[in-house]
Amino acid sequence: NEIVALTIEAKKDKLMAGYFIWGDINLEKNKINIPKRNIIELPIPVQIDNFTFESLLIQNDEAIVIFEANGRNLRSDAWQYSISIKDQKIKRISHPNIEYRINDVTKLDENNTYWGINYLWEGDLDRLLPAEDVLLSDYQTQGIVTDVRSIERLAEFKINNGSIV
């Protein structure tokens, strides 16, 4: 049997809620089994409508659950949950502040590097309250980019000594 892991975004009593869910896949029967005990509600770092844990990254026996909003004005001390697939122990690992949303991530490569889709929709500006976009600052200084209302780009991350950089 293979393991399956998911994140679920939901509303609970008008507040956002995020869940980590795991189970196994029976390839012979073409079925996924997720026992009720394998549903963990994860406290949301900051309440923003329609923002929870959008991405999941597997490193060895750990599932890293990535919250969408990690900007400086929302989370001065950004972090992500890391959950042991073996015993479900939960810890926090540091994460860099990055403005806008992280919508999805690639799998880790052999150097513990991955890429995330870093996305801004103009309608999210009031909810995200973005600080200076350090990934764009060089372009803005040179006058290449002046007015940013939407962005869709790849951002590179690396797991190094138990932290995301």
Regions inferred by a protein language model and the residue ranges of each:
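Sequence/structural signature of beta-propeller domains
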Residues: 1-165
